[in-house]
Design a protein with these regions (language model features):
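Hydrophobic transmembrane signal anchors and adjacent membrane-proximal interface regions, especially
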Residues: 136, 185, 271-273, 325
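Phosphate/diphosphate-binding loops
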Residues: 75, 79-82, 314-324
Length: 325
């Protein structure tokens, strides 16, 4: 088919561009799902197939469907070379362990600002003064914004780890959480802090699936957010940035490059910038989009966007400004 002829060279190129431990996610409707799976088996190899994730794309499916009302899209996942890297899904609330240990030597440890989460119901935005409420002492005043300190800080207590060991753990992806005012800090090792993702990206309340696992939005959520950002309804059915962030968090490291062959409204770019702002990452994005003309009757054309590329470029500019503010 024309669709297969269009996809084949792009997927072939995508495989060649992936690093050895790279991953590809491909969003597809049910109509071409079978064909896409066969195509990817040929290009990436059946052994490198990971999963077909199901995503609830709409909460308002067409009411006039005669057989069924389709709510789902699918995301096909392959690795270039299947490996042992674990994917991070839902964060485990109970996956943390105490860093304090009675009887250990009292020592000072320096923590990076973006590696310690202060539970926001206990630590609202503002200044946390130097204090020793119990067994842990905060050496200096710090400012907390949205659950994170705005600068590195030092804690003093009977800690299990030395500074060198702490630094090694941080390099492996270990993070920390402080849940109460007594500052009893706990650590979350990267491999222990997450469930593996299920193949349902957004659970809905049905007899089969009755637990919502994450905060991934729908097309309607994405349209509302984009309309607010662009001050007009200029792009139909954009993907939610929460979907891209959820997938990226499976495996993407803070210095990785993310390529989108069909960038459309540049959701990938927006999601990557937002991720970087949240964890001080240095991820980069490459967006590829043909300059497909907008219809002269469309809101996009009336707003001055003559092709889809112009929409994406303006979204990147506006999203970048919003993320920095």
């Amino acid at each position: 088919s024309d669709w297969l002829n269009m996809m084949y060279p792009r997927l072939k190129l995508a495989r060649n561009l992936l690093k050895d431990d790279g991953v590809i996610f491909i969003s597809i409707g049910v109509e071409e799902l079978t064909n896409l799976k066969k195509l990817c088996d040929e290009i990436f190899g059946e052994d490198n197939f990971i999963e077909i994730f199901s995503w609830v794309k709409t909460s308002t499916p067409p009411a006039l469907s005669t057989k069924s009302r389709k709510t789902n899209e699918y995301i096909v996942c392959y690795e270039k070379n299947k490996n042992s890297i674990k994917y991070n899904g839902e964060k485990l609330d109970g996956g943390d362990q105490p860093l304090l240990n009675s009887g250990n030597s009292i020592r000072e440890l320096k923590f990076p600002k973006n590696k310690v989460y202060f539970k926001e119901d206990k630590f609202p935005n503002g200044t946390l003064k130097q204090c020793k409420p119990d067994r842990v002492e905060l050496i200096q005043d710090i400012e907390i914004i949205n659950g994170y300190a705005t600068q590195d800080f030092i804690l003093k207590g009977e800690f299990k780890w030395t500074q060198d060991f702490l630094d090694e753990e941080i390099n492996k992806g270990t993070t920390f959480v402080i849940k109460s005012e007594i500052l009893s800090i706990r650590f979350i090792r990267d491999e222990e802090g997450f469930k593996r993702p299920t193949n349902f990206i957004k659970d809905v309340e049905t007899p089969l699936i009755n637990k919502k696992e994450n905060n991934v939005g729908t097309n309607e959520n994405a349209s509302s957010s984009m309309n607010e950002l662009m001050n007009a309804n200029i792009f139909d059915n954009p993907k939610p940035i929460s979907l891209i962030q959820y997938l990226a968090n499976f495996i993407v490291e803070i210095n990785d490059v993310i390529l989108d062959f069909f960038s459309g409204s540049a959701t990938i770019a927006h999601a990557v910038m937002k991720l970087n702002s949240e964890d001080d990452g240095n991820r980069k994005f490459i967006c590829v989009q043909l300059p497909e003309l907008t219809s002269e009757n469309s809101e996009a054309y009336k707003a001055g966007y003559k092709n889809i590329c112009e929409i994406g470029k303006e979204r990147i500019r506006r999203a970048g400004e919003k993320v920095k503010s």
